Amino acid sequence: MKKKQTTKALLVTCITDHKQDFYRLAFSYVKNQDDALDIVQESIKKALSSVETVRNPETIKSWFYKILVRTAIDFLRKQKKIRVMDDETIEFLSKGKEDHYKDTDLHEALDELPYRYKTIIILRFFEDLKLEEIAEITGENTNTVKTRLYRALKLMRIQLTKEDLS
């Protein structure tokens, strides 16, 4: 009973400390504030109901990321949404005086990636996680994560080159 309470307290602390990161990750999938909040809320509910299954409390953040990513992908499968970049989304995702066109092209290229590649790109470059952490979250071998990362970057490069030529 004591371990469950400790793990639950760690989970609550983790969610509180990283709520912006979790929201940003959910938003990167659905491009809608309300849906992103729903995904985070659903992930928290799932995590709290299964917190006793955590074997190593030190990996609670990675464990929650895994729940969040799977919840976001499930949401997209259920909704089968066509994501449109509106002005609010572009403004939310852009930072400062960056070139909005390049930023938009980058996000469109990212959106066109299959989920298994998109997840790795988001976790690596937007959430700044190490390859080992990504492997733990996705349940894949570290070498598989590396391979998918390089393939994803190659696919994005091809997509961005196509857009530059057109």
Curated annotation (Swiss-Prot):
Pfam families, alphabetized: Sigma70_r2 (PF04542), Sigma70_r4_2 (PF08281)
Segments of the chain annotated as binding DNA: 131-150
Any GO MF annotation of the entry: DNA binding
Keyword Nuclease annotated: no
InterPro entries referenced in this protein's UniProt entry, alphabetically: RNA_pol_sigma-70-like, RNA_pol_sigma-70_dom, RNA_pol_sigma70_ECF_CS, RNA_pol_sigma70_r2, RNA_pol_sigma70_r4_t2, RNA_pol_sigma_r2, RNA_pol_sigma_r3/r4-like, WH-like_DNA-bd_sf
Keyword Calcium among UniProt keywords: no
Domain of life: Bacteria
A biological process from GO: regulation of DNA-templated transcription
Chain positions of motif Polymerase core binding: 38-51
Ranges in coiled-coil conformation: none
Keyword annotations from UniProtKB, A to Z: Activator, DNA-binding, Sigma factor, Transcription, Transcription regulation
Subunit and partners: Interacts with RsiV.
Function: Sigma factors are initiation factors that promote the attachment of RNA polymerase to specific initiation sites and are then released. Positively regulates the expression of proteins involved in stress responses against bacitracin, paraquat and tellurite.
Stated family: Belongs to the sigma-70 factor family. ECF subfamily.
Listed name of the protein: RNA polymerase sigma factor SigV
Source organism of this protein record: Bacillus subtilis (strain 168)
